Amino acid sequence: MAELACFCYPHLENDSYKFIPFNNLAIKAMLTAKVDKKDMDKFYDSIIYGIAPPPQFKKRYNTNDNSRGMNFETIMFTKVAMLICEALNSLKVTQANVSNVLSRVVSIRHLENLVIRKENPQDILFHSKDLLLKSTLIAIGQSKEIETTITAEGGEIVFQNAAFTMWKLTYLEHQLMPILDQNFIEYKVTLNEDKPISDVHVKELVAELRWQYNKFAVITHGKGHYRIVKYSSVANHADRVYATFKSNVKTGVNNDFNLLDQRIIWQNWYAFTSTMKQGNTLDVCKRLLFQKMKPEKNPFKGLSTDRKMDEVSQVGV
């Protein structure tokens, strides 16, 4: 995750801003600079290579002292920065909202996946600039639309019905922030269309998840899609979701956290996010993740979670 201000800077033209991507030499100069504390939140002028991000975002970049940041000296960084600028330049961003726009925290891996989709001749985003723009605006939080199947970050499709598409996510070969853990497995479920869904199609998805992915928890980050994650990673997701939610509340970002369909979401996660939305502390909310919940009535007749041991899915073992 990183703020949009880590990729580009605003240049005032008439009454609105044009956004320009950073080059990696300007960022390198900023990373070596000694800057007064009062100037940490200001864009840095490298003198030679142009404008660089505010020094307060140093930890967002991979350096000898910080391996957890993004690899900004890659071609992919430039591609992602240009993708962001193209999207922002399609909007009218004024003095009144430029700060809120650039402080928006976005998913670096999601944006890299959009670049990968854009460069794939078999993908619809390769052929449609309008769809690419729409997908990018959703990814950077500048659209009220949710991420649906056609605007999704992409991945390998492992399940699809009339209402849902399930993607296997892999970041092993990413350039900006690869996940090098060979055991990493995560999935995302997107709605094919943002409209009411019949119980039949919900039941098909729930059956698939309980049958094939019973070693995973179904959660949401509040953005209109489902995530299927290992139970061992749930606490980490909770920390991230809570931090993002609080950050958005603090900065005044419109954050209508979408709890999604309670019949699909893991019961403990639904309790966690509902309590978070009520303004409770992280400790209070996370306690619900490890609490034994009273089993809910099965909303789908004939659909059981009871399986013989030899029938249990091996996905995620």
From Swiss-Prot:
One of its GO terms (biological process) is viral genome replication. The keyword Iron does not apply. ATP binds at residues 107-109, 188, 221-223, 227. It is an enzyme of class 3 (hydrolase). Pfam families: Rota_NS35_C, Rota_NS35_N. One of its GO terms (cellular component) is host cell cytoplasm. It is found in: Host cytoplasm. Keywords: ATP-binding, Host cytoplasm, Hydrolase, Magnesium, Metal-binding, Nucleotide-binding, RNA-binding. GO terms for molecular function: ATP binding; metal ion binding; nucleoside diphosphate kinase activity; ribonucleoside triphosphate phosphatase activity; RNA binding. InterPro entries: Rota_NS35_C, Rota_NS35_N, Rotavirus_NSP2, Rotavirus_NSP2_C, Rotavirus_NSP2_N. Residues 205-241 are annotated as: RNA-binding. Its main location: host cell. Gene3D superfamilies: Rotavirus NSP2 fragment, C-terminal domain, Rotavirus NSP2 fragment, N-terminal domain. Its cofactor is Mg(2+). The active site is at 225 (for ntpase and rtpase activities). Belongs to the rotavirus NSP2 family. This is Non-structural protein 2. It comes from Rotavirus A (strain RVA/SA11-Patton/G3P[X]). The lineage of its organism: Viruses, Riboviria, Orthornavirae, Duplornaviricota, Resentoviricetes.
